[in-house]
């Protein structure tokens, strides 16, 4: 099953929260308390996002974290990569010969296309999409994905065509 790690979930939640914040900043404690996230894990994630240039950290009594760029300029893919490294559906997507079946594999190319499509979709989902979808009655992530997909109809058509060719 393809799914995000809890660390990536927490990072996306934190960035969405910062994008929604009236002041544009929040402490790790404020974010952790609001979403019931483990404080130690969240602190490490926020430090990593700061080190990767997605957040800015302010010290002091009124310190906290804020977005280093506009919410429209930060993608879900950037956040996930900053926390967990690159996104791969299969091990052979990341290493040329990372599989015993490398020489005879018949699904490497279709899976590479699926992997690239997933990366493409994640790169089109912006923190602003997640923020703006928060008030929708539908699932906010579904709404963000729908918005991103509207910009990616061609990718979906290519996948459908690939599937039809294989049948």
Which sequence ranges carry the predicted segments?
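N-terminal helix-turn-helix DNA-binding core of bacterial DNA-binding proteins
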Residues: 2, 6, 10-37, 56
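Conserved segment of winged-helix/HTH DNA-binding domains
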Residues: 71-96, 107, 111-117
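Residue cluster at the C-terminal edge of the helix-turn-helix DNA-binding motif
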Residues: 51-54, 82
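Residues within the DNA-recognition helix of helix-turn-helix
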Residues: 45
């Amino acid at each position: 099953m393809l799914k995000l790690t809890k660390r990536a979930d927490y990072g996306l939640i934190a960035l969405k929260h910062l994008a929604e914040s009236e002041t544009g900043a929040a402490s790790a404690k404020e974010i952790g308390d609001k979403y019931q996230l483990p404080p130690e894990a969240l602190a490490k994630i926020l430090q990593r996002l700061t080190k990767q240039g997605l957040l800015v950290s302010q010290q002091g009594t009124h310190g906290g974290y804020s977005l280093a760029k506009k919410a429209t300029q930060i993608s879900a893919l950037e956040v996930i990569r900053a926390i967990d490294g690159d996104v791969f559906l299969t091990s052979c997507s990341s290493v040329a010969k990372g599989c015993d079946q490398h020489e005879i594999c018949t699904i490497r190319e279709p899976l590479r296309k699926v992997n690239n499509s997933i990366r493409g979709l994640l790169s089109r989902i912006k923190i602003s999409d997640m923020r703006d979808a928060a008030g929708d009655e539908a699932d906010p992530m579904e709404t963000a994905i729908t918005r991103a997909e509207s910009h990616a109809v061609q990718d979906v058509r290519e996948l459908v065509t690939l599937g039809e060719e294989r049948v």
